[in-house]
């Protein structure tokens, strides 16, 4: 019984500390992570549907981006996604990318 209480207390404390860390990120960092996760999910969907990397690049070239750095970053994310042997669903890729991006941003602080 005591072990169960300690495990529950530890879980609650870890959850609260992670939430507190996530709140330290600025709006821009969250936007960049969200945007990147959308690009990664789209690339994974294209890959799983059979679209070639060349075709995915052409779609990105035709797309309008609000910031100059976004086009090349999207190309890099797409290429890394295509080079990965992963067959995960796009929603799983999106979640994983976002979590790792947030973790990376927090580690840089």
Question: Can you say where each PLM-predicted feature lies in the sequence?
Answer:
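Short intrinsically disordered terminal tails
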Residues: 1, 20, 107-109
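Bacterial N-terminal signal peptides that target proteins for export
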Residues: 1-8
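N-terminal secretory signal peptides
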Residues: 20-59
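Compact alpha-helical subdomains of small soluble proteins
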Residues: 51-109
